[in-house]
Amino acid sequence: MYSQNIYVIRKGDMVIRPAFDDDDQRNGSEIIRFDKTRIQNPFKVQKIIERSCKFYGNTYLGKKAETNRITGISSKPPILLTPLFPTYFFPTHSDRQNENIWLNMHYIESIKELKNRKCKVTFINNESIILHVSYHSLWHQYNNSIFYYYMVDKQSRMISKNPDQPIDYNKATLNVFEALTRYSLFED
């Protein structure tokens, strides 16, 4: 499937990576979805990430700053696009590198070390991809995203100091982020 428009990341997206043509030249990006469809897009991976951040209400730099504020992670930080559904993405490389790939942590089943500084990532739908990233580096990035997920969840649960009732409905004002974070854990 080919899309001419700037793509916005949505529920079910597992991977956003650079695409290559028959001559091995960069040709936009490829989005791999949970339902096993692959969408080709003419825009670069970073452009899709930046546009998706704006679509969900913040800039890419704002999302990075949010991660840093909550976790202290400043190098290759994971981002949460929206708390409405699982969109915790982490990069394989610096966002300034053309070979950077973004992975959704919620769909990863396993990461296996291969020879020559490569990894095999297997997803929960049994698809897999080979990445030119060392196991140590990818595992570190994956754990950073898990830590970020934990800190956001912990923050939303502990606001009222009651994990069973994380939102205090008796307060004069309700923080929308608290409510969205709490209900983002529901599946359809």
Whereabouts are the PLM-identified features?
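Eukaryotic intrinsically disordered, low-complexity regulatory linkers and tails enriched in Ser/Thr/Pro
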Residues: 1-102, 109-188
